[in-house]
Amino acid sequence: MVLGCACALWRVPAVQLPLWFGYLGAGGALVWVDFKTTWLPKRLHWIATAQVTAGLAVVAVHSPGVLVTALAGACATSGVFWLVWRFSGSFGFGDVRLGLLVGAAAGSMGLQAWTTALLAGTLIGAGWAIVHALRGRASEPFPYGPSLWLG
């Protein structure tokens, strides 16, 4: 996980580092809890959201365009996830809240990165779901948050 975070930070423009520190720091703790318990605690989510928001505020001073794309990514991701949660029940609401953070971080890198991140997270989640089912646990919930976060 640490190596993955270091690799992610290596690719991020320096002006966006405050946003990504919040995403990888508190967001990483959030998905670790999800991985272990299939539960995304609200309090930890709000801490991660506050850190990402503070990072976005710093980024906006230097690059206002990044703020627009990050907010668009956050709204689009959490909006789509809300629709899936509301009408299919296949997501927990914690995944909807996590979509806000993932969308902001991925959106800050542009439309192509946002699309790639969501596709990668979905593919990682699908792979994890297959492994989960092959282990005979298909009827049990599995944590989608970590795969989404890794995307």
Model-predicted regions and their roles:
Residues 2-3, 52, 102, 143:
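Short charge-dense sequence patches
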Residues 13-17, 63, 133-137:
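Alpha-helix capping and helix-coil boundary motifs
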Residues 1-14:
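N-terminal transmembrane signal-anchor/hairpin module of polytopic inner-membrane proteins
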Residues 20:
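Extended, charged alpha/beta regions that create polyanion-binding interfaces
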Residues 25, 29-128:
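Functional transmembrane core segments of multi-pass inner-membrane proteins
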